[in-house]
């Protein structure tokens, strides 16, 4: 419904069925029988995860730009129009994102959101030159061919099985790879406006925080290696060279992140004792993490 409500409809709609078993394919077909529109449905023979699906689209599509919308994304009506007009207005732009707000499983607004990214090319150049990771919410429009030229979504060099590390911070990896092209005057910016809402599920209290921290370290290391003209390391090689002390520090930071997430949902549900307990656990595990979240998220509450 969010796609059908877009003010700009001149785009090719490609739907990827990652071997779903919940009747999603029939739901899609039934929806478009009732709401006629161009669409292409690609069904994968096996479930390979988020990043593999994105890589398939990058290689399968023929359009200049791509914009992914996942199951828990709720684009506002002007998302496609505003992002497309922005990126197509300046040949220097590689990708354009926006701000994102949070909602619960019933569509009720939650505090916080994703308000990241540079709003000007000059700001982006400064960040890219300093070898900073490029954080931007994943519901963004980007140049498909240029993304592939820097490696696209990476699916090789990861251990088999779960967790699928390639599915963690996959957008961060792509934006950071594309940022290497700042030396050619290319840039990644955001439209400083909430154009998408993201559904956060109350029961999803756990997340692979340790895995995400490892991936961020991996992405940062490869950024520095690329800028020095060195070969990148696979995630398998990166993980193997970590020292025990370093892993313990990352585990404490992951514990802080998980505890703070649980505390938020417990307090919101009125479970005061459980919420306070997890809040103190988060602060004890890594006080710097708690302060950083307050600085970059809670202070943005309207």
Predicted regions and their residues:
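A conserved acidic beta->alpha catalytic loop
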Residues: 17-26, 46, 70
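Short aromatic/hydrophobic "clamp" motif used to bind/position activated sugar donors
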Residues: 66
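Conserved donor NDP-sugar-binding/catalytic core segment of glycosyltransferases
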Residues: 78-111
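Conserved nucleotide-sugar donor-binding catalytic segment
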Residues: 120-217
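C-terminal subregions of glycosyltransferases and related glycan-biosynthesis enzymes
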Residues: 180-188, 193-302
